[in-house]
């Protein structure tokens, strides 16, 4: 069974998502313990949290999967795969067509593979999903002129501050999302751009790319009080900025705009008590909706590609199901060949002269027979002929 647990921007705001994600983590742990789940991929981004699970023992009627929190979507089978294909194609993103999700899914798969909990089935599904995302982007205009969460945050800042020219901006976080923010800011002719990251050399690298200035994390307060705009996008599990931290500085924050695009959030809402204008991922929805309208006509073509690739994947699953049978068949036939070859050689008077000839002959015969049988097995798999597959498997079982 393929099982998907998820929460995303479509069904929950950022505040709810943080809490639901914790519930979902707990639900996954309970399922993992009960069903000994070893094959799974976890995806966590700024506006979604998902688990993809492959386990043939899970009971769909289990009370654990009748979860009380309706904001956790629990999905099974083919619809899970199609959802993943839509996601890698950018159709499920808040910013439709954005390219970052493709890298995020690829990273999640690689992490699962490295940690040895991405088996043959999930590896096939995710490899195909990444391929689908690339094909959709190559064959449609879904990502033409595409914006990202980072550039959408900069657009939001311009709506509230006007032109960013000669403004002083602090970017907190120099990871992938922080780099997207910085890339969008680089075109704005700023007065100054400062980059803060917990690992200082990473901040230095990004700041150098922008002709900006790197900031030590423990000196953040000094730069907060001089900034016109702060955009935060770290992977921290806790708040980076809150009212208490701001009060320790001498700044006047009544004209300060903060945009928090992290999940979990980096900036506590209590900073608003000091006059800060604070926005988060939920506030990007208006920009996201405008972007979706521009790309709506690309949806149908993308969906057609998804359907075609899904059909190809389903066909490949049929072959995966008989791979072990074919491998065992090959071993069984080779064992027979070796035994019979040894018997024949033992009866020869001039062993050295004839052994190699007999070995090559029997090997050639087995290869030809094996090719024909394996071809029939694959054909039976494509035609869903389970009876023939089981018959062949039974014939070559170890007795």
Curated annotation (Swiss-Prot):
Sequence positions that bind substrate: 45-48, 93, 98-100, 104
One GO-annotated biological process of the protein: protoporphyrinogen IX biosynthetic process from glutamate
Residues annotated to bind NADP(+): 173-178
Enzyme Commission designation: 1.2.1.70
GO molecular function, one term: NADP binding
Catalytic residue list: 46
Keyword entries, A-Z: NADP, Oxidoreductase, Porphyrin biosynthesis
Coiled-coil zones: none
Family annotation (InterPro entries): 4pyrrol_synth_GluRdtase, 4pyrrol_synth_GluRdtase_dimer, 4pyrrol_synth_GluRdtase_N, GluRdtase_dimer_dom_sf, GluRdtase_N_sf, NAD(P)-bd_dom_sf, Shikm_DH/Glu-tRNA_Rdtase
Pathway entry: Porphyrin-containing compound metabolism; protoporphyrin-IX biosynthesis; 5-aminolevulinate from L-glutamyl-tRNA(Glu): step 1/2
Site annotation Important for activity: residues: 83
Enzymatic reactions: (S)-4-amino-5-oxopentanoate + tRNA(Glu) + NADP(+) = L-glutamyl-tRNA(Glu) + NADPH + H(+)
Pfam families reported for this sequence: GlutR_dimer, GlutR_N, Shikimate_DH
SUPFAM superfamilies tied to this protein: Glutamyl tRNA-reductase catalytic, N-terminal domain, Glutamyl tRNA-reductase dimerization domain, NAD(P)-binding Rossmann-fold domains
Domain-level remarks: Possesses an unusual extended V-shaped dimeric structure with each monomer consisting of three distinct domains arranged along a curved 'spinal' alpha-helix. The N-terminal catalytic domain specifically recognizes the glutamate moiety of the substrate. The second domain is the NADPH-binding domain, and the third C-terminal domain is responsible for dimerization.
HAMAP family (UniProt xref): Glu_tRNA_reductase (MF_00087)
Family: Belongs to the glutamyl-tRNA reductase family.
Further comment found in the protein's record: During catalysis, the active site Cys acts as a nucleophile attacking the alpha-carbonyl group of tRNA-bound glutamate with the formation of a thioester intermediate between enzyme and glutamate, and the concomitant release of tRNA(Glu). The thioester intermediate is finally reduced by direct hydride transfer from NADPH, to form the product GSA.
Assembly behavior: Homodimer.
Function: Catalyzes the NADPH-dependent reduction of glutamyl-tRNA(Glu) to glutamate 1-semialdehyde (GSA).
Protein name: Glutamyl-tRNA reductase
